[in-house]
Each structure stands twice: as C-alpha cells, then as structure tokens.
C-alpha cells in the first residue's frame, strides 16, 4: 500500500514502517538499514601496542608484557593446584587446611586479575586460554592423582618458591626499565606470595597437637 498525502502531512507511519519500527529498525519506503554484525579483531594475541598515555618506550613495554604474561600463566597454574588440594584435602586437620587453601586460591585468582589488567594497560594482550597459560607457565603443575596432605602442601610450597624467585626477577626488571607502577604491583604480589609460602612452611613443621592415633 502507498502512503497517502494525508499520512505524509501528519507524519504517520506507512505499514511497512510500523512493522519495522517494532523491531527497532526504521526505514524509508521499503529500504531497511541494520547495524553491521561483522566480526572485528581489535588487537591480535601476542601483539604489543605501547600505550601513549603511559609514555613507556615500545621496546620496554614488550619486555614488561612478556614478563607479566609469564607471571600471569604461573599464577593461574598455582590457582588450579590450590583449588585441587582445597577440594581433596582430608584428615584430622581437614577443616583448617581446606579453608586456608580456599583463601590462598582466591588470593592467587585476584593476583592473576591484577597482572592481566596491567598487561592490558601497558598495551599487551593478556593470556587467556587454558592451553596457552599452561604452556607459558615456568612451573609444572601436579598431575591429577590425589596425594596425601603433606605431599600436596609440599608441592604447593615448592611452586610458591619458584614463583617467588621469578617475581623478584621481574620486579627488578620493571624497576630497571623505569616502570615503577608495575614494580609496585609486583612488590605487593611478592609480599603475598612470601606470606603464603611461609604459612605452608608452618603447616609442614613436625610439631603438632594432633595425636598419631587421630
């Protein structure tokens, strides 16, 4: 049907326009326009585009992003191992260790989030896929078997120690490159890592109030 002169004068909608307007698309006559749904890649994985706002040289940013993505990968491997032990811990001291490992895993997840956000702020792309994270991590995760509590905690402390050494190196790198914000982030991360490693060391001491018969 055609739009009548009366409709044109009072601005009413042609039936086609009314039908299309309900779908959120306005047309002129029978011509319809729609928002493009074409997929766009804003930045390729592995690329670094130094932030103009932060004013750090491209070469320095590339080193920082590589280091932080390595930290990110290691932290996620640690997170998953802590969660594994949180789920599977048993024994007389179950509750306390179960709760502690849950808190440690939450701290690791929070640290990973902060590392990823710093990578993005610098102009990099944070690692996100599980396979990429595990491949980039300099620490070896425990296998899927369930071990006794002491072995599990010893493995966690070993991983914390490896990540502590790496974080110290990356703290020095950030400091030497003049990125004091990243250095401060890594310093705070290092303090948390050392606190958890020290806590695990206490759990693994021989002294206990629990009788062997328990």
Residue locations for each model-derived region?
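Short, contiguous alpha-helical
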Residues: 184-210
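Acidic, low-complexity proline/glycine-rich segments
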Residues: 36-54
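Helix-loop segments that flank and shape redox-cofactor active sites
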Residues: 55-63, 77-103, 166-181
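Disorder-to-helix initiation segments
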Residues: 49-71, 145, 149
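Conserved alpha-helical segments that form or flank metal/cofactor-binding pockets of metalloenzymes
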Residues: 83, 89-132, 203
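Acidic/histidine-rich alpha-helical segments that form the ligand environment
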Residues: 117-118, 131-191
């Amino acid at each position: 049907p055609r739009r009548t002169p009366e409709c044109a004068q009072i601005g009413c909608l042609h039936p086609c326009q009314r039908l299309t307007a309900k779908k959120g698309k306005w047309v002129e006559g029978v011509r319809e326009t729609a928002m493009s749904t074409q997929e766009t890649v804003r930045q390729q994985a592995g690329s670094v585009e130094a932030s103009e706002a932060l004013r750090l040289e491209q070469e320095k940013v590339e080193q920082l992003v590589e280091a932080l993505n390595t930290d990110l990968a290691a932290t996620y491997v640690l997170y998953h191992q802590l969660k594994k032990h949180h789920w599977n811990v048993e024994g007389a001291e179950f509750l306390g260790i179960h709760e502690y490992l849950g808190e440690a895993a939450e701290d690791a997840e929070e640290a990973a989030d902060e590392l990823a956000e710093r990578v993005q702020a610098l102009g990099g792309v944070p690692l996100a896929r599980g396979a990429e994270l595990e491949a980039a991590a300099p620490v070896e995760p425990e296998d899927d078997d369930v071990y006794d509590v002491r072995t599990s905690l010893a493995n966690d402390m070993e991983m914390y120690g490896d990540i502590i050494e790496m974080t110290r190196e990356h703290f020095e790198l950030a400091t030497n490159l003049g990125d004091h914000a990243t250095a401060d982030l890594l310093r705070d991360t290092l303090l948390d890592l050392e606190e958890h490693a020290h806590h695990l060391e206490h759990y693994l001491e021989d002294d206990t109030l629990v009788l062997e018969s328990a």
